Amino acid sequence: MAPLSRGLELLDSAVSYALAGAAPGTAQLLRRPTPCPGWDLATLLDHVSDSIGVLHQAVTAGCATASAAPPGHPWPGPDPVARLHGQAAGLLDACAAAGPAERRVAIWDRELTASMVAVTGAIEITVHGWDISVACGARRPVPPGLAAVLLPIAPLLITPGTRPGLFADPVRLPGPASLGDQLVAFLGRQPRPPAAPGPDGT
């Protein structure tokens, strides 16, 4: 569990990865489907914004009971990608200015250390960063170093009891896979694009 003490570092890495995946996002892409069933890119970006709001509220107020958009850095107009940049910067600033990593933070009916909240946020932002990159047509792999730290932690935070409503069931991979693909699969995504049909259409 030593990596939990690196919560802010992991959150920073996750945010950088997600924002890089969102960089190609334009208004023309907002209605594109994502790996999240029934969600287009606009809905996914709104969800990530809400999640950042909850994390920001937890870090600054010591508790979070509902989705709340944080007062992050300003962004120009209604561009959801620019909004995400501003909110992510505000969240990282708030985490850096907050108290000890061991302090207790309440999120809904759970009480976690601040560092565990940051790691939980890193997992969610990482997987949604992957979702965003797929929707934008890039399918950026999760950085190996980030995946190596998050992969053994994820099953401790995402259990059979906490998974429903948050993540789909793990996807079984047919063979050897990178750490990033293993993480994405554990979080209910198919990390590899469907195989192209053969000459006979199969």
What are these regions (language model features)?
Residues 1-10, 14-17, 24-37, 57-202:
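Structured surface interface patches that mediate subunit assembly and partner/cofactor docking
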Residues 44:
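Extended, alpha-helix-rich binding/interface surfaces that flank or overlap catalytic cores
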Residues 47-48:
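Glycine-rich loop at the start of a catalytic domain that most often binds anionic cofactors/ligands
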